[in-house]
Curated annotation (Swiss-Prot):
UniProt remark on cofactor binding: Binds 1 Fe(2+) ion per subunit.
Gene field: JHD1
Domain of life of the source: Eukaryota
Compartments, record wording: Nucleus
Example of a GO MF term: metal ion binding
Cofactor: Fe(2+)
Organism taxonomic ancestry: Eukaryota, Fungi, Dikarya, Ascomycota, Saccharomycotina
Domain JmjC intervals: 141-328
Function in brief: Histone demethylase that specifically demethylates 'Lys-36' of histone H3, thereby playing a central role in histone code.
Enzyme class: oxidoreductase
Binding residue positions for Fe cation: H224, D226, H296
Source organism of this protein record: Candida glabrata (strain ATCC 2001 / BCRC 20586 / JCM 3761 / NBRC 0622 / NRRL Y-65 / CBS 138) (Yeast)
The name this protein goes by in its record: JmjC domain-containing histone demethylation protein 1
GO biological process: positive regulation of transcription elongation by RNA polymerase II
């Protein structure tokens, strides 16, 4: 997910590019002082419209944070799967070909795909949110318009723009398989597939699982948290990306909230206030995994095509609930929050009760159950149970079984 840009998937965005939004309308998700960096730079170097003013500070911070990268921030897919429940740091998968991640269309697979291929698969007239990197605002373009822009030589582009919210799980002409570990750990899939008596055919699940991102050289996405503290998988088809990621320590989260609610947020470089940053550079073919709650900023040194998505996990329920609270404190509007989040948490409660009654052995921390009950007890949390008379009965049963 910041006043000027959209939220999620390692880079801020809205949930669905084809939501009904008036064409060419600029919009943000918090009301703040609007600052157009290109306008501020007008009259200076004409090239300034092609560089976000924070890039120099980003590069300095990136070099500093390289020293915090450790050997275990690169591991095989097999090792990652074995250690998944204990991993709380970002890392690269050293053998992405063994992950199960694959995207293909027109007899081409991930590394050979182009923006033209994506446009053909999704449709020329499909609308996408296009972010102006300087103003950090969005406009609605057709995919054909975007494709034409992307393919122009750099000197012919009028501004630096970014597409980071094209959800493609519905696209029939695009075979898109997530990493196997993501399919196994996705909490939405777990509860939708296993809670008894759910009408899953008439009850669509949240669509935040499969995205296509397209960034031109010098695109920049300012500091943000992915919505609801979701974890992220991020597969670079071609190009280059630079990330700086900071752990969700109490101090970092406090500074993030202060920055997010500042009237002049756009002019402040948050990296100067955060600690423990890790710098990661991604190249074509890399598969990157971001855990729950990491604050991060992204720079694009080369034109890039990325496939990735967000997912909730049972492992991170407590952290995810903390980030949901941060979203409330910083005034994130519903459009930029995880869809049906309360429904997912409610179904998680039912799933836990169901498993315990059936004698299924699960390692469940009391902290997780307490945090879940506390969140669900709130009168602001709306959920109608499927297998209980009401929410109160469900939570009492959950407490009796686990606490």
């Amino acid at each position: 997910m910041a006043v000027k840009i959209e939220q999620a998937l390692g880079e801020k965005r809205s949930l669905n590019d084809n939501d009904e939004v008036p064409r060419k309308k600029r919009y943000n998700f918090r009301k703040k002082v609007e600052l157009d960096y290109s306008a501020l730079n007008e009259g200076e170097d004409k090239k300034s419209k092609f560089f976000h003013p924070h890039i120099a500070l980003f590069e300095k911070e990136f070099e500093k944070c390289l020293s915090n990268v450790t050997e275990d921030m690169s591991m095989t897919c097999s090792e990652y799967c074995k250690r998944f429940d204990d991993i709380d740091f970002p890392l690269k998968i050293s053998d992405p070909e063994n992950s199960g991640m694959v995207v293909s269309t027109n007899n081409k697979t991930t590394r050979d795909l182009t923006v033209d291929d994506i446009t053909q698969a999704v449709g020329d007239d499909y609308f996408v949110n296009v972010m102006d990197v300087q103003s950090q605002e969005n406009e609605r373009w057709s995919l054909r318009e975007w494709c034409n822009y992307f393919n122009k030589p750099a000197e012919e582009k009028d501004r630096i723009r970014n597409v980071i919210s094209l959800e493609v799980s519905h696209v029939e002409d695009l075979q898109y398989d997530r990493p196997d570990i993501v399919d196994d750990k996705d909490l939405v899939d777990i509860v939708w597939n296993n809670v008894e008596n759910l009408d899953t055919e008439n009850d669509p699940r949240p669509k935040v699982t499969k995205y296509c991102l397209m960034s031109v050289k010098n695109a920049f996405t300012d500091y943000h948290l992915d919505f609801a503290g979701t974890s992220v998988y991020y597969n670079l088809a071609f190009g280059k990306k630079k990330f700086i990621l900071y752990p969700p320590t109490p101090e970092n989260i406090e500074n993030y909230i202060e920055w997010s609610t500042s009237t002049y947020q756009n002019m402040l470089f948050l990296g100067e206030k955060l600690t423990g940053g890790v710098a990661m550079e991604l190249n074509g073919g890399d598969l990157f995994m971001i855990p729950s709650g990491y604050i991060h900023v992204v720079y694009t040194p080369e034109d890039s095509l990325i496939f990735g998505g967000n997912y909730l996990t049972f492992r991170d329920i407590s952290q995810q609930l903390k980030i949901v609270d941060v979203e409330k404190q910083t005034g994130v509007t519903k459009r930029y929050t995880f869809p049906m989040f309360d429904e997912v948490m409610g179904r998680t409660c039912e799933w836990l009760c169901q498993n315990q009654k059936k004698g299924k052995q699960m390692q469940v921390k009391k902290e997780t159950v307490n945090d879940l009950i506390s969140y669900m007890k709130s009168g602001k949390t709306k959920y109608k149970p499927t297998n209980f008379i009401n929410k109160k009965q469900m939570l009492q049963e959950l407490s009796n079984l686990y606490l």
